[in-house]
Amino acid sequence: MKTDIHPKYAPVVFRDLASGATFLTRSTVSSSKTIVWEDGNEYAVIDVEISSESHPFYTGKQRIMDSAGRVEKFNSRYAGFGTKK
């Protein structure tokens, strides 16, 4: 097996910017920013805009769009389109 071909796999903190939640996990991603975790150790921190803590699919706060009104509006706007005069 070849040595030194695998990326560095280390503990990393992911911080959700939308909810402020933080997750400690292992990853190959690195960052120059660091944070002190609850255990007192310092880890690299990666800021993410959305995670399972703030995504509507996982939080159950999904909005269902009313597409029926949009279809009717489209049909009324283009009802006579393509007919010869």
From Swiss-Prot:
Gene Ontology terms: biological process: translation
GO terms under cellular component: ribonucleoprotein complex; ribosome
InterPro entries reported for this sequence: Ribosomal_bL28/bL31-like_sf, Ribosomal_bL31, Ribosomal_bL31_B, Ribosomal_bL31_sf
Pfam families: Ribosomal_L31
GO molecular function: structural constituent of ribosome
Cystine pairs: none
PROSITE patterns, per database record: RIBOSOMAL_L31
HAMAP family according to UniProt: Ribosomal_bL31_2 (MF_00502)
Database matches in NCBIfam families: L31 (TIGR00105), PRK01678.1 (NF002462)
Record's subunit section: Part of the 50S ribosomal subunit.
Family according to the record: Belongs to the bacterial ribosomal protein bL31 family. Type B subfamily.
Protein name: Large ribosomal subunit protein bL31B
Protein's organism: Clavibacter sepedonicus
Gene field: rpmE2
